[in-house]
Regions:
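Beta-hairpin "wing" of winged helix-turn-helix
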Residues: 53-56
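Basic amphipathic alpha-helical segments that dock to polyanions
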Residues: 39-49
Length: 118
């Protein structure tokens, strides 16, 4: 399964807006995606140190519940929160035929934000 960066951004935004730091964001709470895809992305984000998540897998299926953003998660979301910046990042990466990697997204987002400043 490939990483879906729009889903990753959606997860981070949803976790940030969650008022209660003790409640879980279940993989079924993200609309528009099947729970297995969301659970896989929770696992990726947890392994990357971007979110805190619990492994709630059963014998039948892998599943995760997201708890909160880490410091690194907040820092990354700060770079891609703005819709204009996010769309510019995606179009820049695509126009330059770059792979959408975590480091490339951070670099392009930083450059995009810098270009917006006076």
């Amino acid at each position: 399964m490939k990483r879906n960066w729009d889903l990753i951004r959606k997860i981070l935004l949803k976790l940030e807006e969650k008022a209660d730091s003790t409640s879980w964001l279940m993989s079924t709470d993200i609309q528009g995606y099947d729970f297995k895809t969301v659970a896989y992305h929770y696992k990726l984000l947890k392994n990357a140190g971007i979110i805190e998540a619990l492994d709630i897998s059963t014998m039948e299926e892998e599943n995760f519940a997201a708890l909160s953003l880490t410091w690194q998660g907040h820092e990354f979301l700060d770079k891609i929160r703005n819709d204009s910046v996010w769309n510019k990042v995606k179009s820049t990466v695509q126009s330059k035929s770059l792979d959408l990697s975590f480091d490339v997204i951070k670099q392009v987002a930083t450059a995009t934000i810098s270009a917006m400043l006076p």
